[in-house]
């Protein structure tokens, strides 16, 4: 994953593998700071990888940054944050079976889901 400023200058490069779809949601308290949580499907390892975006816009590596799926070939991804009950869900598609899987994030340090 590359990040850029508004003039197109590269700010960061995170060599995480083949990240396919990315989505993010705001206002999480992780590692004692308020951040946005970025999730992306990693096609090399069939998992969901995570990065943190600080309030200053900087993207940081997240030490506990992945969740292994049982999918054969992860592909599409989107997130949903239910503000009524403070739950976050990630929906992932499997390219081979065309199935859609739903995961609920149950903790953030380290990332875990069910």
What residue spans do the PLM features occupy?
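Generic structural motif
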Residues: 22, 77, 113-114
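Short, conserved, GDST-rich strand-edge loop motifs in beta-rich repeat architectures
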Residues: 35-36, 101-103
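Asp-box/WD-like beta-propeller blade repeats and closely related beta-sheet repeat scaffolds
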Residues: 46-88, 92-93
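WD40 beta-propeller blade core
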Residues: 2, 49, 99-101
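Short loop/turn segments immediately following beta-strands, especially the blade-tip
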Residues: 27-30, 50-60, 83, 103-114
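Short loop/turn segments immediately following the C-termini of beta-strands
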Residues: 41-43, 93-96, 105
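Blade-loop segments of beta-propeller domains
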Residues: 5-46, 61-65
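Extracellular cadherin-type adhesion modules in metazoan precursor proteins
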Residues: 1, 90-92, 106-111
């Amino acid at each position: 994953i590359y990040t850029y400023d508004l003039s197109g200058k590269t700010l960061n490069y995170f060599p995480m593998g083949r990240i396919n779809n990315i989505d993010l949601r705001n206002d999480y308290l992780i590692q004692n700071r308020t951040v946005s949580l970025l999730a992306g499907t990693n096609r090399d390892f069939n998992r969901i990888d995570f990065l943190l975006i600080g309030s200053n816009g900087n993207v940081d590596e997240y030490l506990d940054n992945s969740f292994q799926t049982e999918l054969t070939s992860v592909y599409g991804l989107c997130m949903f944050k239910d503000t009524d009950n403070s739950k976050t869900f990630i929906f992932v598609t499997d390219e081979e079976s065309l199935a859609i899987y739903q995961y609920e994030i149950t903790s953030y340090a380290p990332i875990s889901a069910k």
